[in-house]
Swiss-Prot record:
It comes from Mycoplasma mycoides subsp. mycoides SC (strain CCUG 32753 / NCTC 10114 / PG1). This is Lon protease. Residues 612-793 form the Lon proteolytic domain. It comes from the Bacteria. Belongs to the peptidase S16 family. Residues 19-213 form the Lon N-terminal domain. Induction: By heat shock.
Length: 796
């Protein structure tokens, strides 16, 4: 038994540590080196796991006294070791674990203990002493020069580091040089670790050079020389490794050979399976030829070469693409209607158009025709509508996100000769679908962009055009693929961003934002049920009142869809579950007060109409990405020289509208009872509140005109009126967009009467009936009509 390094002369030890231990068979590792070692014993594997889980990947490596002892006693372990960091860990098929160890510190072990089938070392790490005096440095330099001159040992690298005065690096370099030397005995390595000065290590290096290849150095009478090298093994290994190194080398070699053989056997077996499938299944002849050609190349190539991997991946892809597999469609319009109604509230026109499309498809048995494209803001149900259509038709559903795609190869794939090449997104999605007739959702098709790597929109044209997609060409598979049985549906947020060539082949279905009433129905009939089901709650445990839904919709969300609404409902459900599990409550009825308690203070405040009718203040109607809102416009006059000031972060279009409105009022001042001289004696200030929010658009013309007339004639405008429409210099009122959203916001804000362009009368049918019931909508074609209603009829 060797209890080595109980005392080391002149060494100051650092703090005591406790770390798990792995035991090697006759292999002793030097500091500042790294090695990959394989461990198979249970205690060592347990120690590796403990190191990774509890000790920040630190572990102590020690050697056992006898390499032949399978389970050495703690007394048969050396009391000197190294502390290592685990960096790579791999588990082999036979259960052994291969790890890469980086050795950085030496440790004197005071005691070994065994806990939970893991060996732990309790000891103190210690460091080497670096030279401080000139005399010490001179001796080191002399030793290096002696190695060079007398013993023909190349010390140029050591001298270079010495001249840099980097003694830490010099110390590490000596360890690394000795570690790479063949047949360094275990005893020598132990003595090297015991040594704490660079000069002592250089003396050991000199002994190794002088006595190679038989070098063994005795360890201060404290260490037995048990690292005898078997002569027969020395002969076989040509004096390059000792017994323990040979055993490790052979084990590692056997494992690698076994892995290679297993890989080759599995490849051969897989290729045989592919050949059998080609014989039994109806692959197209041209596809069979390509696959068989690649299989033959694999069989003639050197195993493990890069070309084999390229061909193997190609064969795997070609065999996994659905060349003939199809799902059976459901042709039942009533069932389709039931599915759409089940998953979506409202959207009457959208559902009608979808049913019409499916009816034509069922009648003609063809998918030719425009590609359905859902256009609308985020969260209004574009993707879920596509899923519902897939369910109604019994089709597999696959989705490809095109947002941010700039490279044509994303669509058509890379040629297989490139490193890491693979098919494009279309073929990849078909592989996931496992049938050649899925419903294919092209999400955010308006977000594609072109650059110097090609134009993905042009590639998408080949995908979507029925005249071209019968022979879609993917660069990787190098075989035409028939996409004519695929049903494509696209989604977009903005029509204007869709490439023109694609837009020409699309049937646009607009999904506008939901009204507050629709959101409440969706929350009650869909979202709440979904959340209760996901959280395994019952309606008896958690119930929302209509007032609670209204509170969340108005003051905690500002969106066109219902995603944020769903998140807030889920937040309340989670907070309730916490209280439920803590035993604080057993059920909860969510009211306005509970919403504020669970979600905190209001996030949004909707703009309300003015409390009083005022001079120079008129309510306009705006359309935003979140739906509609009202837009108060203020005009004030004061003594000046006829200047016009615009504030409120207005866009260029809105600034032009203000200029046109002022010009129109000046040109028709007599009709409005305004003195011509007044314009020269005053300055006019137009302001749109919430100055930090950008505002633009062409629909504020009649609102600006009315506010100017009110301010100049000192006539108030009723607080119950709202209006929208652009104006020309001749006083014509031009049509606007977003009438549905604007009408909803007007009713929500408490307005009773709105004026709209007469050319928008056709859009009134899109306004929800519940809004029409509380809001009077009057069309106007010229500004005289507006003036008549606002200033004449209203003041009588």
């Amino acid at each position: 038994m060797l209890q080595y390094l109980k005392k080391i002369k002149g060494v100051s030890f650092m703090k005591t540590i406790k770390l798990p231990v792995v035991v090697t068979r006759g292999i002793f590792i030097l500091p500042s080196t790294s090695k990959t070692i394989e461990f198979g014993r249970v205690k060592s594997k347990n120690a590796l796991d403990a190191s990774a889980d509890l000790y920040n990947n630190q572990i102590v490596v020690v050697s056992q006294e006898s390499p032949l002892e399978e389970e050495p006693n703690l007394e048969h372990l050396f009391y000197l070791g190294t502390v290592a960091d685990l960096s790579v860990k791999k588990v082999w098929k036979d259960g052994t674990i291969s790890v890469e160890l980086n050795y950085n510190q030496k440790i004197k072990i005071d005691e070994f203990v065994e806990e939970d089938n893991i060996i732990y070392a309790i000891g103190s790490v210690f460091e080497d002493k670096l030279p401080k005096t000139d005399a010490q440095k001179t001796k080191i330099k002399e030793a290096l020069e002696e190695l060079q001159e007398k013993h023909s040992f190349n010390t140029s690298e050591l001298l270079l580091v010495f001249n840099e005065n980097d003694f830490n690096k010099l110390n590490s370099l000596i360890y690394q040089i000795i570690d790479k030397m063949p047949l360094v005995s275990l005893n020598t390595k132990l003595l090297l670790i015991q040594s704490t000065s660079i000069l002592e290590k250089l003396e050991l290096l000199k002994e190794l050079i002088i006595n190679r290849p038989k070098s063994t150095i005795k360890l201060n009478n404290n260490l037995n020389n048990n690292s005898t090298v078997d002569s027969e093994i020395n002969k076989k290994l040509k004096d390059k490794m000792d017994k323990q190194q040979k055993e490790y080398y052979l084990r590692e070699k056997m494992r690698i050979i076994k892995e290679e053989l297993d890989d080759e056997n599995s490849d051969a077996s897989q290729l045989d399976k592919y050949k059998k499938r080609l014989e039994e299944e109806p692959f197209p002849e041209s596809v069979k030829e390509k696959i068989l050609s690649s299989i033959k190349r694999i069989e003639t190539m050197q195993p493990g070469s890069a070309e084999v991997n390229v061909e193997r991946n190609y064969v795997d892809w070609m065999m996994s693409i659905p060349w003939w597999e199809q799902s059976e469609d459901i042709d039942d319009l009533k069932y389709a209607q039931e599915i759409l109604e089940k998953h979506h509230f409202g959207l009457k026109k959208v559902k009608e158009r979808i049913i019409e499309y499916l009816a034509v498809k069922q009648k003609t048995k063809s998918l030719k025709g425009p590609i359905i494209t859902f256009v609308g803001p985020p969260g209004v149900g574009k993707t879920s509508l596509a899923r519902s259509i897939a369910e109604a038709l019994g089709k597999k559903f696959v989705k490809v996100s095109l947002g941010g795609v700039k490279d044509e190869s994303e669509i058509r794939g890379h040629r297989k000769t490139y490193v890491g090449s693979m098919p494009g997104r279309i073929i990849q999605a078909l592989k996931r679908a496992k049938v050649k007739n899925p419903l294919f959702l092209l999400d955010e098709i308006d977000k594609m962009a072109s650059d110097n790597r090609g134009d993905p929109a042009s590639a998408m044209l080949e995908v979507l055009d029925p005249e071209q997609n019968k022979e879609f060409s993917d660069h990787y598979i190098e075989e035409p693929y028939d996409l004519s049985t695929v049903m494509f549906i696209a989604t977009a947020n903005y029509i204007e961003n869709i490439p023109e060539a694609l837009y020409d082949r699309m049937e646009i279905i607009n999904l506008s934002s939901y009204t507050e009433i629709e959101k409440m129905h969706i929350a009650k009939d869909y979202l709440t049920k979904k959340i209760l089901e996901e959280d395994q709650l019952t309606e008896d445990e958690l119930r929302f009142t209509d007032e609670a839904y209204d509170e969340i919709i108005k003051y905690y969300t500002r969106e066109a869809g219902v995603r944020q609404l769903e998140r807030h409902l889920a937040t309340i459900a989670r907070k309730f579950i916490v209280k439920l599990l803590n035993g604080e409550i057993t059920n909860l009825v969510v009211t306005r007060e509970v919403v504020v308690q669970y979600l905190g203070k209001h996030i949004f405040e909707h703009t309300s109409k003015e409390e009083e009718s005022q001079v120079g203040v008129v309510t306009g109607l705006a359309y935003t990405q979140f739906g509609g809102d009202i837009l108060p416009i203020e005009v004030s006059t004061y003594n000046g020289k006829g200047n016009l000031t615009l504030t409120g972060k207005l866009g260029e279009v809105m600034k032009e509208s203000a200029t046109i409105a002022l010009t129109y009022v000046k040109a028709n001042h007599e009709k409005f009872g305004i003195s011509k001289d007044k314009f020269d004696d005053i300055d006019i200030h137009i302001h749109v509140p919430e100055g930090a929010v950008p505002k633009d658009g062409p629909s504020a013309g009649i609102t600006l005109t009315t506010a100017l007339i009110s301010a100049l004639s000192k006539q108030p405008v009723s607080k119950d009126f709202g209006m929208t429409g652009e104006i020309t210099l001749r006083g014509n009122v031009l049509p606007i967009g977003g009438l549905r959203e604007k009408s909803i916001s007007a009713a929500r804000s408490g307005l009773k009467h709105i004026l709209i362009p007469s050319k928008n009368v056709k859009d009134i049918e899109d306004v929800p009936q519940e809004v029409q019931d509380v809001l009077k909508i009057t069309p106007v074609s010229k500004y005289e009509d507006v003036y008549e209603i606002i200033f004449k009829n209203n003041n009588q």
